[in-house]
């Protein structure tokens, strides 16, 4: 189980001044000493509707104290340095308290999506061997705690609703003999891969802080600003984009989840937010219906980040020329990809919408945090040769202080180049019209990108094949205006068998514990699936056939 960087890497990054001794919780202690009464975390006002718990507003000092008390309680239950704890919570203050509490203990937190069911939780247990799982009794009626107990068997499940009070000890001293290793794993996030199951991505404090500094540089964050986080606090977008910048700059973290557009727009105004992220479909809608935006007072708001799919140049133009708000385009991953297109490095809305600076590429210079330490290039995915000619697609490869060391329990084959660059699996090209920038072309693999959430098609293939009277089955992406891509189930019935309905397919996958957001939203029946000479389904051809049907 690879959970820690090599001594060689630690020495290299430390000597370069890119890694240090700060931890997530040491930053909190520093902030609490400087501004004890500044707000640190603010719950969404509809929290009671989500979990039944009251919405809270914690100062920096209160967050430091309750996270220390929570750490002591977890220690009394057997959690120690090096342990792994799965946490399945929505964006609420309890989740933030647990990040800091587990950081203080030196334990690794594995945050998971609240949509995940028994199928995914069982996999996490097998891969991670967690000491416990922490969740909530119900989320909008969904019995998360009971679902986890059913899936995990003898692994303890602790419920923040009525079993684990993370707010106890509000008046206790925050000081303690806390962990101080910035190179220890802080999180194990999860990402989908072509193996058909999510892969664990261990990341240390130093890796996360490198990403947080890069985001902070791009957003020009200042001390004491206020952030609104509408995305699940479980991956690069929210951890590298909100949690760590908030700790680095002593900022207030206002929470929101799941996306409720009227509430989100109201929070932006009422909480006097300076920075937020927003999904492209929402930004497009606001640009097309400016009256939705202009009914509010957003004078405090400076910057909005977005990404996951190409942005609209027209949207960027409306936000910047009419609304006076800067748009940043992010392209990242849990493994440590962090391409950022800003007003400074990509002034044109047309370029910023679809292109990203070639950070650290030979002959290309952009100002950034860790300038010269973050390097990117394009390799031929088959030969490994470096591609320097514009317009020739290849695999994006990344090297830098924010890049992880490798997947959990993985042999590393195909993950890194011989000289240590992470092979992203994403196809990019040097833009012929703007050779200082990359253009995203597609993906080397077949991952489905549903609204920024990447899904593994082979995982669903395996659950459909041999079931429901099917001779063959595979899923593929199809284009969707709002989410970018959705899932289509492509089936070949056994001879003389009736094809299943879409509802039957969805019910079957649900019975296997598959999360709702992974379920197919379209069904197509075929006489045979397109395959290559080795018998592998040609998913790109399959997608073309699906989309040709309208």
Q: What residue ranges belong to the model's regions?
A:
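AMP-binding/adenylate-forming catalytic core of the ANL superfamily
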Residues: 116-123, 133-135, 276, 400, ...
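Structural core segment of the AMP-binding/adenylate-forming
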Residues: 76-77, 105-169, 495
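ANL superfamily adenylate-forming
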Residues: 6, 45-52, 56, 139-182, ...
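Conserved AMP-binding A3 loop
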Residues: 57-61, 186-210
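Conserved AMP-binding/adenylate-forming
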Residues: 269, 304, 311, 315-328, ...
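Conserved AMP-binding/adenylation subdomain of ANL enzymes
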Residues: 209-226, 234-275, 283, 289-290
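Adenylate-forming
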Residues: 135-145, 231, 257-259, 273-318, ...
């Amino acid at each position: 189980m690879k959970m820690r960087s090599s001594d060689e890497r630690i020495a290299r990054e430390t000597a370069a001044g890119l890694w240090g001794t700060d931890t997530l919780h040491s930053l909190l202690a520093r902030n609490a000493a400087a501004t004890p009464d500044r707000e640190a975390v603010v719950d969404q006002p509809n929290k009671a509707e989500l979990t039944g718990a009251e919405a809270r507003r914690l100062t920096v000092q209160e967050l430091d104290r309750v996270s220390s008390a929570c750490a002591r309680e977890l220690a009394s239950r057997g959690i120690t340095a090096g342990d792994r704890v799965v946490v399945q919570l929505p964006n609420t203050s309890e989740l933030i308290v647990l990040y800091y509490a587990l950081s203080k203990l030196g334990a690794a937190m594995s945050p998971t999506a609240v949509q995940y069911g028994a199928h995914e939780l069982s996999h996490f247990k097998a891969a991670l061997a967690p000491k416990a799982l922490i969740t909530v009794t119900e989320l909008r009626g969904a019995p998360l705690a009971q679902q986890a107990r059913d899936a995990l068997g003898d692994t303890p499940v602790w419920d923040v609703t009525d079993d684990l009070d993370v707010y106890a000890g509000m008046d206790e001293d925050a000081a303690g003999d806390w962990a101080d290793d910035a190179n220890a794993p802080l999180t194990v996030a999860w990402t989908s891969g072509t193996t058909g199951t999510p892969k664990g991505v261990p990341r240390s404090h130093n890796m996360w802080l490198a990403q947080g500094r890069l985001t902070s540089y791009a957003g020009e964050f200042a001390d004491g600003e206020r952030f609104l986080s509408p995305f699940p606090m479980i991956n690069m977008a929210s951890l590298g984009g909100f949690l760590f910048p908030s700790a680095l700059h002593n900022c207030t973290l206002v929470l929101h989840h799941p996306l409720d557009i009227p509430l989100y727009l109201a929070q932006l105004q009422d909480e006097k937010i300076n920075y937020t992220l927003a999904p492209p479909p929402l930004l497009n809608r606001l640009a097309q219906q400016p009256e939705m935006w202009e009914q509010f007072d957003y004078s405090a708001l400076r910057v909005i980040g977005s990404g996951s799919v190409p942005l609209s140049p027209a949207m960027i133009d409306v936000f910047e020329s009419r609304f006076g708000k800067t748009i940043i385009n992010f392209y990242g991953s849990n493994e440590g990809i962090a391409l950022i297109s800003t007003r400074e490095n990509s002034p044109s809305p047309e370029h910023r919408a679809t292109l990203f600076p070639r950070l650290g590429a030979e002959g290309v210079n952009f100002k950034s945090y860790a300038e010269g330490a973050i390097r990117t290039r394009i390799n031929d995915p088959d030969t490994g040769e470096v591609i320097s000619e514009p317009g020739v697609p290849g695999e994006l490869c990344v090297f830098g202080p924010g890049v992880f060391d490798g997947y959990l329990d993985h042999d590393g084959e195909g993950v890194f180049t011989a000289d240590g660059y992470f092979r992203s699996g994403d196809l990019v090209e040097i833009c012929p019209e703007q050779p200082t920038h990359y253009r995203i072309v597609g993906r080397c693999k077949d991952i489905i990108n549903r609204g920024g959430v990447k899904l593994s098609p082979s995982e669903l293939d395996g659950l459909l094949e041999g079931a429901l009277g099917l001779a063959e089955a595979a899923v593929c992406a199809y284009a969707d205006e709002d989410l970018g891509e959705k899932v289509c189930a492509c089936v070949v019935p056994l001879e003389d068998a009736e094809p299943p309905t879409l509802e039957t397919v969805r019910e079957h996958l649900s019975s296997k514990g598959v999360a709702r957001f992974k379920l197919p939203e379209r069904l197509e029946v075929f006489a045979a699936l397109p395959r290559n000479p080795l018998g592998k389904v040609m998913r790109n051809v399959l997608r073309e056939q699906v989309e040709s049907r309208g």
